[in-house]
From Swiss-Prot:
This protein's name: Dihydroorotate dehydrogenase (quinone)
EC number(s) on file: 1.3.5.2
Keywords: Cell membrane, Flavoprotein, FMN, Membrane, Oxidoreductase, Pyrimidine biosynthesis
UniProt binding sites for substrate: K65, N110, R111, M112, G113, F114, N171, N176, N245, T246
Cofactor note: Binds 1 FMN per subunit.
Cofactor(s) needed: FMN
Task performed by this protein: Catalyzes the conversion of dihydroorotate to orotate with quinone as electron acceptor.
Annotated GO biological process: 'de novo' pyrimidine nucleobase biosynthetic process; 'de novo' UMP biosynthetic process
Family named by the database record: Belongs to the dihydroorotate dehydrogenase family. Type 2 subfamily.
Chief location bin: membrane
Localization in the cell: Cell membrane
MF terms (GO), sorted A to Z: dihydroorotate dehydrogenase (quinone) activity
Length: 344
């Protein structure tokens, strides 16, 4: 069954239940060995952060928080999969309802709150999966951990996931964990990156191999914050930046049903602001830090916009919900066409 036929059925369901059902159906299709026949794998080889990717279009964190569906999702043609956000201990997240579709705007508001089964559960799934491509693991802090002790949670997760991840993303930009975004500014960011990078260097020595470290930031940053974060990335030799997470802005959706719900807004309305922030970081970092563009990509053309703004690779999430799995191939082909045109 095509996604276009399935979507009306899914969109009549509770969003979180529909999310769970979609992943379950995807897993069944994977086990029946039909996914690869439908979607296949487009090649657009990409080197980034010292890693080789089959193509530059990845799955953003949040869709498969616990790594339960890595093999099934990989068959949609992604060049890499990012799982999480995962925390040291399992946690239920915020109360339901916590996920809202804004259909008129092709947007989603979520206040999930890092619901996950804990880092050890995720590691078991990563070890069990058969996918041979790059897997990023996105780490966060437990809601019960005071922000002053956040570094302890991040370092704990870093230690646990290090030997199992292709790269590790430090998520300090979710708006749904109290005070988490405070870690993006001033001494809090410096203290966090210092603790993480010190342990990261030790782990590289202990294991004898290097796992790239990535920071994920919000789109709700002013130029001073962009400048400061950029300098911290350079000072601590962070390998990559994911720009961006969801926004607290409600511009363009404030009058829609559920447009005033608390949480982070993703989808089409965040496209412009996230691309602007990406461009600002690109200007500041001048190719010294790998950039992954995410936010509002619902077409191949939007993916190319991220590349034009300085992204080395892109990630999808909300666009998949509205456009379906065919979006992956569309983005790969559009990016490939863009690079071909640049060479000619």
């Amino acid at each position: 069954m095509s996604y276009a036929l399935l979507r009306p059925f899914l969109f009549n369901m509770d969003p979180e239940h529909a999310h769970e059902m979609t992943l379950s159906l995807l897993d069944k299709a994977h086990k029946a060995r039909v996914l690869g026949l439908v979607y296949g794998q487009s090649m657009q080889p990409t080197d980034c952060m010292g890693l080789q990717f089959s193509n530059p279009v990845g799955l953003a964190a949040g869709l498969d928080k616990n790594g339960d569906y890595i093999d099934a999702l990989a068959e949609l043609g992604f060049g890499f999969i990012e799982v999480g956000t995962v925390t040291p201990k399992p946690q239920a997240g915020n109360d339901r309802p916590r996920l809202f579709r804004l259909k008129q705007a092709d947007a989603i508001i979520n206040r999930m709150g890092f619901n996950n089964e804990g880092v050890d559960y995720l590691i078991e799934n990563v070890q069990r999966c058969k996918y041979k491509g790059n897997i990023g693991i996105n780490i966060g802090k437990n809601a019960a951990t005071p922000v002053e002790k956040a570094a302890d949670d991040y370092v704990y997760c870093l230690e646990r996931v290090y030997p199992h991840a292709s790269y590790i993303t430090v998520n300090i930009s979710s708006p749904n964990t109290a005070n988490l975004r405070d870690l993006q500014s001033g001494e809090a960011l410096t203290h966090l990156l210092d603790a993480i990078k010190n342990r990261h260097s030790q782990l590289a020595t202990e294991y004898g191999f290097y796992v790239p470290l990535v920071l994920k930031v919000a789109p709700d940053l002013d130029p001073i914050q962009v400048d400061y974060i950029s300098q911290q990335l350079l000072d601590f030799e962070i390998d990559g930046l994911i720009a961006t997470n969801t926004t607290l802005s409600r511009v363009g959706v404030e009058d829609l049903p559920d447009g005033d719900q608390a949480g982070g807004l993703s989808g089409r309305p965040v496209s412009h602001i996230s691309t602007q922030i990406l461009q600002q970081f690109s200007d500041q970092l001048d190719g010294k830090v790998a950039l992954i563009g995410v936010g509002g990509i619902d077409s191949g053309a939007k993916a190319v916009k991220k590349i034009e703004a300085g992204a080395d690779m892109v990630q999808l999430y909300s666009g998949l919900i509205y456009k379906g799995p065919g979006l992956v191939q569309s983005c790969i082909q559009s990016i490939g066409g863009y690079y071909d045109a640049m060479e000619n």
